[in-house]
From Swiss-Prot:
Organism of this sequence: Homo sapiens
Comp. bias intervals (Gly residues): 194-210
Tissue note: Ubiquitous.
InterPro entries named in the record: Anti_prolifrtn, BTG-like_sf, PAM2_motif, Tob1/2
Subunit details: Associates with CAF1.
SUPFAM superfamilies the UniProt entry points to: BTG domain-like (SSF160696)
Disulfide bond sites: none
Organism lineage: Eukaryota, Metazoa, Chordata, Craniata, Vertebrata
Protein's name in the database: Protein Tob2
Amino acid sequence: MQLEIKVALNFIISYLYNKLPRRRADLFGEELERLLKKKYEGHWYPEKPLKGSGFRCVHIGEMVDPVVELAAKRSGLAVEDVRANVPEELSVWIDPFEVSYQIGEKGAVKVLYLDDSEGCGAPELDKEIKSSFNPDAQVFVPIGSQDSSLSNSPSPSFGQSPSPTFIPRSAQPITFTTASFAATKFGSTKMKKGGGAASGGGVASSGAGGQQPPQQPRMARSPTNSLLKHKSLSLSMHSLNFITANPAPQSQLSPNAKEFVYNGGGSPSLFFDAADGQGSGTPGPFGGSGAGTCNSSSFDMAQVFGGGANSLFLEKTPFVEGLSYNLNTMQYPSQQFQPVVLAN
């Protein structure tokens, strides 16, 4: 009796899944099983299977079986919801060794379960059972022969576990081979667009061995930073009023300022007005020869940056560090500076 009730309940509950709350549908099945077992006590005749068949029939339609109404009430479902989600005029006969159903008053009677001990008519019933399978009922699997045991059946046992009883069949774990997993998106070995060439080159270079990756090009020094340095240098020179007539010897030249070349070239002095005199044609103390002299109004750059006893600044290497520009060709920002005239 327990097996036949399970088959009938799984068929009915399969229509409620995905339409009503799953937990409520499970509770409805548990309550209906309990009530049917109690109802069939004393009305189950294995020796005469057809005896009391009308009494054991479960009908859901315009007239709903009182057992179904009570099970819906106890599980928190409305009878109208149960009736609206099952086929119209559904009748299920639960008899010893056989479970069948009918949809509609004039519908054909189809077999859900038949325990044929002698084995006659089993192949024909298999086709009938498959054709009567509910496609929306992924949980329900009809039982076609006696060889199907309870352990293999997806029908749960009510009352044995507090968890939901109508559990869908568990999906088989998906296994991958190395080749099949590599073909998936997660295991794809293809390079992304834009980085394939670089990545391929890196792999090739690592495979060849001994080849160093190409160095990144150095960033060019910003001319703005250099102009700012020149600006600070010129302003600091304009503010000086320390002038000496004796040029400093070659040995007192700062090693960091050897690249700094001052070319007078007969042009007006950078730091003095034309009234103070023109610079001589000979190179200044920063020239390549290092032996030239200046007039009385010349500006002794080596004395300032050299580090002698009369030097105003002992060490000012940050002003001239890294400079390799000619003062005559030096380009200043667009802002115009007024020349400063130093009085004798």
